[in-house]
Amino acid sequence: MKLKTCITSLALLEGLVCISAQNAKIIPANTIAITPTDSKELIIEKAAHVIPTKNQLDALRNEFIAFIHFGPNTFTHMEWGNGMEDPKIFDLKELDTDQWCKSLKDAGMKMVILTVKHHDGFVLWQSRYTDHGIMSTNFRNGKGDILRDLSKSCQKYGLKLGLYLSPADLYQIENPKGLYGNLSQYTKRTIPREVPGRPFSNKTKFEFEVDDYNEYFLNQLFEILTEYGPIHEVWFDGAHPKTKGGQKYNYEAWKKLIHTLAPKAVIFGQGDVRWCGNEAGVTRKTEWNVLPFNNKDLTEITGLTDWEEDNIGRRDRLYDAHFLHYQQAEVDTSIREGWFYRDDVYQKVRSADDVFDIYERSVGGNSTFILNVPPNREGKFSDQDVKVLAETGKRIKETYSKDLLQGAKGSKQVLDHNDITYSLLSNNQLIVESKLPITINRIVLQEAVSTHGERVESHAVDAWIGGKWKEIAAATNIGYKRILRFSEVTTRKIRLRVLQDRGSVAISSIAAYYYKMRPPQLTILQDKTGKVSIDEKKQPFDWKNQDKKDIKDKDKDFNIYYTTDGSEPGINSLKYNGPFEKEQGTIKAVAILKGEPGAVQTEVVGIAKNKWKLSESKDGTKNHSAEAAFDANPKTFWQSTNQNIPQSLSLDLGALYTLTGMAYTPQTAFGGGMMAKGIVEISADGKKWETASAFEFGNLVNDPSKRDLYFKQAVKARYVRVTAQEVAGNSQALTIAELDFF
């Protein structure tokens, strides 16, 4: 049968290849179609020929990039605004984008993405098409332009610039004259719309058949893509706090404009780059970037019902696809609890240990790491954040700037630190030998994804120790990059073995490094009786990369010290020897290894729950009784049988306490029933109630982390009633994994 190929022009793609012959030569492409007659073997062969575009490859090479969330939420202490905030709430006096960029550069980042418009519709640049933004604030007498400042600082510090422009727009929804969902007709419109006195230096014109809101969005895209220097990523969030009027987005028009005005930009959420499935920095054991899709728009991953599912590119899913397409993941999380800055007292900041760990798991797991660093109300990064960024960058540089295989004997194509050159493996093995013995605990592998795609499905690495090969690490796929972590070994020879593949394997790089072990991160837990335990944090990944017993004996001879009064712990503090009793206090703990302190872990502990009981009976679904909401086990949860709102849970704490706040832990079994908004009421006798505080927890579905609520003033109570007035997610039946009162 003769080879039959067809190239279809699709927005966002650099080629759609269709192969009809079972034995035809497959041309590498960004997207390859599957036909009904394709065998499973041919489908896997096609998958092995799916490659990134040049823009995608450049984005992969960025590896570590920054998010900056800044806007009215910074001043209202909220995660999501409502769109009706007075712009003057954004009460910025000073702005230091040079400090931002220097800090990000010190961390080893290569690009920064700014939320120029979040869901509230407030814009951070001098737009011609709205007055809901920086132009209506007192910042620089209404003449300030945060995007302009950041663009200049990026150029100064050699950082690429990306833009987050939320398709959702609560201002355009809530404003009586708003354009979102106003049921306007689709008519031919010229982009950009001319505004008297504000001409564009870029004279490019577009004609699209769109409605009012799509025109508004396109006009704003035109502004930010033509007046602020080169743009390398455009980020379209999929979150929608609210919709109206059946508003649809004309993504094809948006993409055409972006491809024309920002030809080097990748687009998040529309074919180029995708979400990793969580906002907590959790990475998959296996992260394929060659994915199965149902449609040409590349919006429906075959078989995917939940973005948090594991291994979304596995073989059995490929067999059911209509298209195979390269779409890389970004692992996005925040350096702080929440996307926006709230305060420097209660809002916790990730340690450098934590950030460096996520860096190795994401960049070393075939993904890009995007870390949010939110500026404070003084227009700067807080000191805590800057210190963490500097320490993270120091560790990255100390660990990965010197390849210990430099000058080693082996294929020069895998030792030249060039991800374009490669070596095709013979017998699926590769051996390199150093001139002298080297001590290592990191191996970095890369496939030649730009020419040969992703082919390794599982692999192992051996070291020559004591006259024989010893396996020191193993994992699943490799892709753009895989970082293997293991206990330190000293060797001269390293062997890569590919155990399963999708075709002839092309390795572009193998490198070896040494990471100086630090004291571990800690976790602080309180049980139902009030006893507090402190232990090493369990890492959220499961690579076959470390012999736990060996590490415990060799590398982890550390002690834990703690305080119970909120003061900083050190070697002169209480030494942890086992669980201790503590109610209503702030525990701070640190591990010290060979005189070096690790990151300080802080946890506010509440009232012991062994005397708590329901003051009003509440039904729960099977295996999810109301008592699970206060059993000191965040893995269990109460799920109400009632789907009506409001819903409440009333508790008898067993005695009269002075309370300063509450903590709510959402369940993580599914994305629904989360307590987004409500009130906390207190009572001394269970009959007469008064409100202690209202609460609103944003972004729970994407980030179901523990949320703290501090009352404006301390209250005395024996009885507490928590009422949910709004529930987030795909189920209205209220769920609570844990309630704490402190």
Residue ranges with predicted function:
Residues 473-477, 568-576, 699-700:
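Short beta-strand segments within Ig-like beta-sandwich modules, predominantly Fibronectin type-III
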Residues 380, 384, 388-391, 399, ...:
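Aromatic, loop-rich ligand-recognition surfaces of beta-strand-rich domains
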Residues 23-487, 497-509, 723:
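Mature catalytic domains of secreted/periplasmic carbohydrate-active enzymes
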Residues 113-116, 598, 682-683:
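Ser/Thr-glycine-rich phosphate-binding loops at phosphate-binding pockets of nucleotides
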Residues 515-648:
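Short, compositionally stereotyped local motifs that mark structural "simplifiers"
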Residues 1-25:
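Bacterial Sec-dependent N-terminal signal peptides
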